Amino acid sequence: SFAKVEYWDKLCEGIDKAEQELFSYNVEVERMCFNQYDKSSFDELIPRIEEANCQGVVIATQFHDSVVKLASRLDQLQIPYILIDAFIENTNCVAYYGTNSYDSGYIAGRLLYEQINPTENIAIFRFIRKGEMQVTQVMKREEGFRNYLAEKNYDGRIYSVQLHADEPEKNINILNAFLEEHKEVNAGIIFNSRAHLLGKYFRDKGERFRLIGYDVIDPNITCLNDGSITHLIAQRPEVQGFNCIRALFRHL
């Protein structure tokens, strides 16, 4: 499941375009959606995919262990699959479409480091998930981010701010409490496309906060233009979605 302004909406636009172009070849894409903040909803799809009688699968790699389980089952059934969003090792995927998560986090570390002093405290904002603490891609991005700072001998403190996927009022209270307690923090990062939610919060508060986010979606671009987001790291999800369907078609 996704909101219409998110990375996944853009990715589906690319999938739709590829399906339309391959219509004359009798290519049909069946979408099976899950809650990206609830691992159990992904797990519930696995038996449905096994029974779907499909010739190929595109897997969004939100939950590492569940993706490995599904990939293993598809290997047994001899059904080819493509991974999208984050690469998972020890799978036999036909192809992977997405950015190098570690490298993008490393770049994000450089972008933020250039805006702060080496002892300045910063924040990492996260949206809480059910069933698995972090998605594979986010973990790799954060690893790259932290490693860059470590290489630069960054000596500040990195705070973790846990937010809730569908509770905006609760999030405002969490952010208010955090900033009240840590008035010195005015720089941070979020490793997904929801940077605009934070950008809007800081804009409405009149706070000058140096924020880095991911994905060039319209609300994020608005925040980038008004200065409530300082940098965005782009993935071009519509191209990823298009290419994964085309690649699976060529393989078959």
Residue ranges and their predicted role:
Residues 66-103, 217-229:
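Flexible loop/hinge segments that line or gate small-molecule binding clefts
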Residues 108-152, 248:
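An alpha-beta-alpha
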Residues 1-44:
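Amphipathic helical "hinge" segments at domain boundaries
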Residues 44, 56-75, 157-221:
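Hydrophobic alpha-helical
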Residues 1-11, 94-95, 121-132:
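Short beta-strand segments enriched in small/hydrophobic residues
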Residues 203-252:
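Flexible loop/turn connectors
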Residues 96-123, 171-172, 220, 236-252:
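Hydrophobic alpha-helical segments within soluble ligand-binding/sensing domains
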Residues 8-16, 43, 102, 106, ...:
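Short, surface-exposed alpha-helical segments at coil->helix boundaries
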